[in-house]
Amino acid sequence: MSIERITYDNFQNDPFINELDINDETKGAYEILKWAYQTYENDIVYSCSFGAESMVLIDLISQIKPDAQIVFLDTDLHFQETYDLIDRVKDKYPQLRIKMKKPELTLEEQGEKYNPALWKNDPNQCCYIRKIKPLEDVLSGAVAWISGLRRAQSPTRAHTNFINKDERFKSIKVCPLIYWTEEEVWSYIRDKDLPYNELHDQNYPSIGCIPCTSPVFDSNDSRAGRWSNSSKTECGLHVADKP
């Protein structure tokens, strides 16, 4: 099917949601990515967390656009294992253009201006400074961005479509993996022998910044372990979307 270039201003609905064959090996993900890069070319960015879903998307993207632009929001609070994984990904996919996007404030400057442990006292403000504002800067020159959201991850993501109007960033958010289960993600990683964050083998289902990520021993929730001492469930990158 032929789909026009969808933008924030002309978005009406997801044209793929009832049309795309989701029974193929990638549950529609490959076709969505192929359409996205053909349509947006250099006007699309993959904001990559380097979690398990990221490994699937990176592998698929490399088959479509080997020199795709990938942005990692480097908060300066990530685990060393995450940085080690990025190095392994660079070795495996040398053509990918991986950009480490840092916040305007260093941790020291943030501590002086707000609080030395802002992630504890005001995690929403910390996420805004170190993740949301940097992504706003990245997307200021892009029409669309790619995310690894899956519907099964959490109730807040259950209505995610392939193509979404992103109200927070005033852009189009492309989510190729919405129909994938966690088991399918890991089967793909194992079958393709892809690199992944070693913390996943140490009971970390979801990996973010060190102060806000904990190992989990008694939950099947793929988002468990994030902000475990508060009611917070999202960093803020995905909370303003409309189904």
Swiss-Prot record:
Binding, [4Fe-4S] cluster: 126-127, 209, 212
Record-linked InterPro entries: APS_reductase (IPR011798), PAPS/APS_Rdtase (IPR004511), PAPS_reduct_dom (IPR002500), Rossmann-like_a/b/a_fold (IPR014729)
Record EC number: 1.8.4.10
Pathway membership: Sulfur metabolism; hydrogen sulfide biosynthesis; sulfite from sulfate
Cofactor(s) required for function per UniProt: [4Fe-4S] cluster
Record-linked SUPFAM superfamilies: Adenine nucleotide alpha hydrolases-like
Cofactor note as given: Binds 1 [4Fe-4S] cluster per subunit.
Molecular function per GO: 4 iron, 4 sulfur cluster binding; adenylyl-sulfate reductase (thioredoxin) activity; metal ion binding; phosphoadenylyl-sulfate reductase (thioredoxin) activity
One GO cellular component term noted in the UniProt record for this chain: cytoplasm
Source superkingdom: Bacteria
One BP term from GO: hydrogen sulfide biosynthetic process
Keyword Ligase among UniProt keywords: no
Keywords carried by this UniProt record: Cytoplasm, Iron, Iron-sulfur, Metal-binding, Oxidoreductase
Catalytic activity: [thioredoxin]-disulfide + sulfite + AMP + 2 H(+) = adenosine 5'-phosphosulfate + [thioredoxin]-dithiol
Enzyme class per UniProt: oxidoreductase
Active site annotation, chain numbering: 235
Subcellular location: Cytoplasm
Task of the protein: Catalyzes the formation of sulfite from adenosine 5'-phosphosulfate (APS) using thioredoxin as an electron donor.
HAMAP family assigned to the protein according to its UniProt record, in alphabetical order: CysH (MF_00063)
Family: Belongs to the PAPS reductase family. CysH subfamily.
Stated name of the protein: Adenosine 5'-phosphosulfate reductase
The organism of origin for this protein: Staphylococcus epidermidis (strain ATCC 12228 / FDA PCI 1200)
UniProt lineage: Bacteria, Bacillati, Bacillota, Bacilli, Bacillales
